[in-house]
Amino acid sequence: MDFILKMKDKSLKNIKLTREEGLRLFNSNLEELIKEANNIRKEIHGDGIDLCSIINGKSGRCGEDCAFCAQSKYHKTNISEYPLLDYEKIKKVAKENEDEGVHRFSIVTSGRGLYGEEFERVITYYSNLNKELKINLCASHGIINKESLIKLKKAGVKRYHHNLETSRNYYDKICKTHSYEERVKTIKNAKEAGLEVCSGGIIGLGETILDRIDLAITLRELEIKSIPINVLSAIKGTKLQNMIPLNEEEILRTIAVFRFINPEAKIRLAGGRYLLKNFGENAFKAGANATITGNLLTTCGNKIKDDKRLIENIGMRIF
């Protein structure tokens, strides 16, 4: 207990925790760990929950070999494959989310990146959405250069999403068609272009607890202010189809430690919420203060109205 309180004090003072301290926290008393992670969240952020939503704007046929992903051409899955959606379809979904009180909306596209005519089309999409709607715009278009990121910002995008997925040490066990450094460079490019950055990862890929802590520390070093935590949904046909799902306690411990290491960030529940009781009710009591709501890329999420009810029932509020 004394150790957890000491770590809480360091976190509130924004003193960086070490990986050894992170590991000790992970293995500490669950009830006290969750309680103090929640107290850090309350003291720094209050009781507001940030909601975001996404649309799978271009699906499948991805040339990268990410072991977890249903959209990779290296995997045989039953997902829908289609090119970039037309503007009216995307606008309709964005407007529905805005009307429901969601704060942010992102177009997500499959592939290493988005190039040429498709990229220019999506720039037009963002520009039009920015003029016609009030919802904050985010973008997720893979590995990208600074020049293209500046174009996104000029079109009205406020935040770029690009996950690191796991630790630097474990990354080549998950993907070999591009490097960890390319992902880090994309994040740095986005920040240099004046964009906010959303970056997190996936837990349950076969990584160690130290890999998760290393990821949390890397995100802290990059000063990421929105950190989505996905829990692997093992999809049939992918390389990780036989991975055993994480149990709720391990997920909650991970969320709590991420809160200690990244006290000023939004810790955002993302994919795999269905593995948690009531789509993550306890996670919001373990330091999380944001969530993706609605459907995800190739899996179903929680309905917006149900998330709003959940948040209200636990005594928190939507920003």
Swiss-Prot record:
Co-factor binding comment: Binds 1 [4Fe-4S] cluster. The cluster is coordinated with 3 cysteines and an exchangeable S-adenosyl-L-methionine.
NCBIfam families: bioB
One Pfam family linked to the record: Radical_SAM
SUPFAM superfamilies: Radical SAM enzymes
Binding locations of [4Fe-4S] cluster: 62, 66, 69
HAMAP family linked to this entry: BioB
Name of the molecule in the record: Biotin synthase
Biological processes per GO annotation: biotin biosynthetic process
A single GO molecular function term of this UniProt record: biotin synthase activity
The EC number(s) this enzyme carries: 2.8.1.6
Residues engaged in binding [2Fe-2S] cluster: 106, 138, 198, 268
Pathway connected to this protein: Cofactor biosynthesis; biotin biosynthesis; biotin from 7,8-diaminononanoate: step 2/2
Function (record text): Catalyzes the conversion of dethiobiotin (DTB) to biotin by the insertion of a sulfur atom into dethiobiotin via a radical-based mechanism.
The Radical SAM core domain, residue ranges: 44-273
Family, similarity comment: Belongs to the radical SAM superfamily. Biotin synthase family.
Keyword annotations of the record: 2Fe-2S, 4Fe-4S, Biotin biosynthesis, Iron, Iron-sulfur, Metal-binding, S-adenosyl-L-methionine, Transferase
Catalytic activity: (4R,5S)-dethiobiotin + (sulfur carrier)-SH + 2 reduced [2Fe-2S]-[ferredoxin] + 2 S-adenosyl-L-methionine = (sulfur carrier)-H + biotin + 2 5'-deoxyadenosine + 2 L-methionine + 2 oxidized [2Fe-2S]-[ferredoxin]
Organism, scientific name: Clostridium perfringens (strain 13 / Type A)
Cofactor: [4Fe-4S] cluster; [2Fe-2S] cluster
UniProt xrefs under InterPro entries: Aldolase_TIM (IPR013785), BATS_dom (IPR010722), Biotin_synth/BioAB (IPR002684), Biotin_synthase (IPR024177), Elp3/MiaA/NifB-like_rSAM (IPR006638), rSAM (IPR007197)
Binding partners and assembly: Homodimer.
